[in-house]
């Protein structure tokens, strides 16, 4: 009786729950999963090299960082479900302590884009905001964008999400940033950028980090 009931329930499944021929083909394609694993390892290698060059840059820089900042802390993360897509990222420099954050995240978001972002909250944020205004033209025009999202963990780009940091937007950006206890400035690049094919992700990340240093200098 239990088996009959179970079978009866199975036969009531909606057809949209069945695998399509294309979906079956993907599930059966072992090369697809092997290729995915190769890509994961290659991206990790690129992020590890980026960590190495960022560590070198950090050791040569005098920056306004939280008192308990530890330059040895680093985080490599791999996941599957950032809006249904895989992702890999490096956090370095990395500082998360309660409501205090000062972290540079390098994110490879499969199916979307590369994102290099400086994330700051609490601590020296007031000085970082002042540096943003005082040194605006050292930061503007470099392909950076200010996040408009109410959360630091939104990674989309474009209208309603980000505002490009261009020389003609100083007053507008200063007004947006005024009074904020946290903010994020990011550079977005398509995944088909030539640098991805040429293994230059570490170069892009380092250049973005350097472009943000005026925010962090005393």
Feature locations, PLM:
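N-terminal amphipathic/basic-hydrophobic helices that include classical n-h-c signal peptides
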Residues: 1-9
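Mature, function-bearing regions of proteins
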Residues: 33, 37-40, 52, 65, ...
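Short glycine-rich, low-complexity/disordered patches
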Residues: 54-72, 141-155, 215-218
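A structural detector for beta-sheet-dominated domains
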Residues: 93, 147-149, 188
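Phosphate/nucleotide-binding catalytic core
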Residues: 11-14, 68-77, 110-113
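Aromatic- and glycine-enriched beta-alpha-beta binding-site module
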Residues: 81-141
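Long, solvent-exposed, polar/charged low-complexity segments
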Residues: 11-58, 161-218
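Short, internal acidic amphipathic alpha-helical interface segments
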Residues: 123-178
């Amino acid at each position: 009786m239990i088996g009959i009931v179970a079978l009866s329930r199975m036969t009531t499944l909606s057809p949209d729950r069945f695998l399509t021929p294309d979906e079956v083909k993907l599930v059966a394609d072992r090369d697809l999963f092997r290729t995915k694993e190769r890509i994961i390892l290659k991206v990790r290698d690129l992020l590890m090299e980026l960590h190495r060059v960022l560590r070198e840059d950090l050791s040569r820089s005098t920056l306004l960082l939280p008192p308990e900042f530890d330059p040895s802390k680093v985080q490599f993360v791999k996941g599957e479900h950032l809006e249904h897509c895989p992702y890999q990222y490096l956090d370095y420099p990395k500082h998360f302590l309660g409501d205090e954050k000062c972290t540079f995240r390098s994110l490879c978001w499969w199916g979307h884009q590369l994102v290099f972002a400086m994330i700051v909250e609490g601590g020296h944020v007031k000085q970082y905001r002042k540096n943003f205004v005082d040194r605006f033209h050292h930061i503007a025009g470099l392909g950076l964008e200010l996040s408009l999202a109410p959360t630091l963990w939104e990674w989309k780009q474009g209208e309603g999400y980000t505002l490009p940091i261009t020389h003609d937007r100083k007053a507008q950006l200063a007004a947006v940033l005024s009074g904020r206890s946290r903010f994020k400035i990011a550079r977005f690049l398509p995944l088909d950028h030539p640098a991805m094919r040429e293994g230059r992700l570490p170069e892009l990340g380092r250049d973005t980090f350097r472009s943000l240093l005026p925010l962090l200098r005393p």
